[in-house]
Each structure stands twice: as C-alpha cells, then as structure tokens.
C-alpha cells in the first residue's frame, strides 16, 4: 500500500550545496538506475541528500490506482501523471509543487518558489481537483549517504561520470509537454549544464 509521511529538514552547511538544484546524469552515467535522469534535490545536509527524478513518467501505477490503494477519494476528472521518483522507498508518494498552496509539513525550497510534500493530506487535496497550480506526483526517491553525493560530484571515477548541476528552472520541471519524450528534458538539461560549465571555465581563465 502506498504511504505518505511528513519530514522535517535540518539545513546544514555542506561542501557542495545541491539543495534546491537539479542534478543531471552525465551521458556516461555508470549506474543504470540513473541513466538519462534529472533529479531535483529537496534535501542536502550533513546526514546526506535526497531527491526525486522529474523526467520519468510511470506507466503504472497511475494516479487512480494510487488513490484507490490509499483509500483516497478522487473526483473522476482528476487523473494526474505519476513520475518515477527514484529506486528507494518506491511505495512512498511525494508531490513536488509550486508554493501557491502548501501545508505545514511542506518543505519549501529555492527561495520559497518550490515545495516538496510527503503528506497524505496533499494527495487528498489534489484528488479533489484542488491544490497547487504546478505539481509533479512522484513515487519513490533517490538518496545518498553523508558525503556520498559530494564524492560523486567532486571525485567520480572519471570526469565524464560526474553529475552535472543546474539551478532550478520552473519551465524545465513543470513545463514538460504531456506528449514529450522522457529524454527531452534530460537532453535540454545536459546542453544547458555543459554551456554553463564552459562559460564558467572561460570566465575563470580570463580572471586568472
């Protein structure tokens, strides 16, 4: 049965602060679970990091099935897509959403522009056709132990295997077309991240 739970975030200083940012799997990602994925990091502190994939739609279960399993009353017209959030806690339903609607349990991030909620109440509101304007319903999540994500970014097996990073972009995350291919957003993110990294290196060369 699908479950929802609440959580509190303790923000601490990390070597690399990825909280509220997008992690993009490199083209040579060695872990098949993360190939061609874009991950929104909703927590990053000294205990580790957690995020949800935002570009992999689930064929099953759909929103109707999740509501039925959780005994959540759903209006027939409400049937949002469900996204595969990651390879752990695959029975946990989360909602990544705009902050025009939040609960006391919502984790607000990115200058309060986006929230991530692990709370049954959010699912109940959405099932009534209410709630935030923009949302991604996720099933499962990605998780890293303390310092693990920093190590994967700073000291990968080869430079080509390092995660790419982008600032959060509402249009990228919530602007995905309903009929777009799952890889479309990943390809756009890789392109943007490479351009950003190239500009950063070029700027550093001129400064030095």
Task: Report residues per predicted region.
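Short, Lys/Arg-enriched N-terminal segments with co-localized hydrophobic residues
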Residues: 1-14
